[in-house]
Amino acid sequence: MCVVRIRSGYKKHKQTNTQGDEDTMKGYPWSGTRRRFLQGSAATMAALYGLRPVQALADIPNEYDGSKFQLAAPEPNPKHGGVLRMGILSRLPHFDFHQSGTIGSLGSQACMYDNLIRHDPRDSGKTIIPDLAHSWEIAKDNKTFTFFLRKGVVFSDGADLTADDVKATFDRIAKPPEGVSIPRSILFKSVSEIVTPDKYTVQFKLSAPRSPSFIMAAIASGWNGIVRKKTLEDNNYNLRKVADIPGTGPFKSVRRVENEVWVMEKKKDYWNKNLPYLDGIEFYNLIPFSPELGSAVLSNRVDYARIVDPVTARKAKSTPGMSTTAFNQSVIQGIWINDKKKPFDDPRVRRAFHLAMDRHVMVDVTKDVAPMRVGGFIYPFSEFATPTDQLFKRVGYQEDPTAAIKEAKALMTAAGYGNGIKGLDFMVRDIASFKLWSQAFQAMLQQNIDVQCNLRTVVESVWFDDATSGHFDLCIGAIVSTLLDPSDYFNAWYRPSGPQDYSFWNNAKFNDLVDQIDTELDPAKRKALIRQAEEIMEQDPPVLPVCWEQINDVWWTYLKGYNPYDYFGLYDVAREDIFWLDKA
C-alpha cells in the first residue's frame, strides 16, 4: 500500500498499473507539504514567474515589397563555420511534420524547410517577414492575400520551387485528404481556394473577411514548411513514412540514428547566400525535463538544450558562460476523457472528473521537473483569459478543494455512479511530467470519487495513434496551438471538426458560439462570447485542463543569433538559420 497526501490528510491508496505492480508514491513531490501557489492577475502572475506578458504581433502592412530583404543575424560580423550540438526531443511519431503536434518532429526537421512567410527569429517571432515569398499584397476587403515568390530557389533534390508547390502544400494543410490529419487545418477554414496566377504568384482567397493578423500568422506558422507537389503526389499525399522529404531550407539531412542523433549539414546552394552560418547541426535525442538533458548541457556535451528542468535552469543561471530563459509554451497539458464510451457520454461524469482534480497540487507535483501554472480552458497569460484572481475563486480552481470534491461526489451519485467506477484504461505519454501527473490524478480519482484506473505508458507514436482512434478511457498528454486567439484552439481542440478533439466532444451551443467568435469584430462583444463559451466548457468539459507550461532553455553564451526572451511557444522560430558560434 502507498500513502498519498491529497490536501485533507494521508489516506491509503492502492496504485495499479498494467503490470499489476504496487509502486510506492513515497518521496514524490505531492507527498510533502504543498507550497502555496502564487495568485494575482495575469500580468502579475507573469511577473512572478519571471515571464513577460505575451505581446501581440507587430502591425502587418497591406502591401510589402521585400524584394531586397535578406535575413541576417542581429549581431554585427557573425562568424561562419562550426557545428551546433543541440539537445532536444527528436523521437518522431512519424516523418510528416505537417501531421504532427510535437516538438519531437519540428525541433529537428524545421531546419530543412522554408515557409511562405515567417516569424522573425530576431524579435522572438513578433514580426511577420518574407521567406520564400519576398513580397505580399492584402486586398482592402481582407479576402484576397497575394504572395510573390523568389526565383531560383531549389529543393534539396535539385528541383526548382514554383507556385504549384506552395499551392499543393497549403491545399493539403487547409483541406487534408482522407487518412491525413493536420492540426493546423482549422486555421484555414475561411480559405475557399488557393490559386496560382503564374509560376511565381500564389493567392489565398477567403470566403469571408478575416483579420490580416490572424491569416498572416496562420500562414507563417513554423509548422507550414513548403514541400514539393511531386513528393506529395508520389506518396499519395501522406508523408508519414518518407524519411527524407525534400525541402528548400538551409540544412539537409546527412545521417540519422533512430532515437539517438540526427545530423544535418549546410545546404551550399541555399537561396539566402549569407545563410546559414553554421556548417551543420547535430540533434541529440534527449527527453524534455530529464536529468540526462540537464547533464548534457551543464557538462558542455551539447551547446544548447531545449526544455530543461528547473534545477538545471537554476544551475545554468549561476554558471559563468551560460544563459537561460523562460517563456510561455503554446500548449495545454490535459487529460482527455473518451466521450464515445460510457460513462463519459454524461456531462455530469465529465464535470465530476474535472472537479476531482486538485490543480494546485498538480502544479506542485512537477515543480522540480517542469514549471507549470494553474489555468482553465483558455491560455491563462492571454488577454482573453479570466483573470487569475477571479479564476481561483471558481470551483475546481480554488486553493481549498472541499467544495469541488463535494460537488463531484454529488454529480457521480446523480449520474448513477455513487459507488464509483473500476478498471479504466488511462493512457500516459512517456514523459516524466505526464507520468507524475497520471499517478497523482489516479490517486485523486480513487480518494475523491472512488474511481480506479490502470495506467498504460506509451511512446509518442502509440499515444497519438491511440488518441486519434479513441483507444483509451482517459489519456494524458499535451497538444499545441498556433495562435493565442481562441478562434484557433477553440476550433482545433474543442470542436468535432477539430483535429485535436481527442475526447470526441460535441456541444452544439459551444459550436454556435465559436462560429460567432470567429466573425465578431467588436472586441468587447467578442470577449463576452468567449466568456459564454468558457462557461459551457466548465459545465461540460471537453478536456480536463491539468496546467499550462513554461519552458526553460539553456545554452552556452558563445552561441549567438538567438533571441528567445519573448517567445510564445517554440514552434515558429525553430530553424537555426541565423545561429552562429562565437568561438576562436
What are these regions (language model features)?
Residues 72, 77, 363, 376, ...:
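Extracytoplasmic/peripheral linker and loop segments enriched in polar/acidic and small residues
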Residues 150, 269-315, 450, 454:
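Ligand-site clamp/hinge motif
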Residues 372-414, 431-436:
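Structural transition elements
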Residues 69-71, 87-140, 171, 244-248:
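N-terminal lobe/hinge region of extracytoplasmic solute-binding protein
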Residues 113-123, 219-276, 280, 291, ...:
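Gly/Pro-rich hinge or "lid" segments in bacterial periplasmic/extracellular proteins
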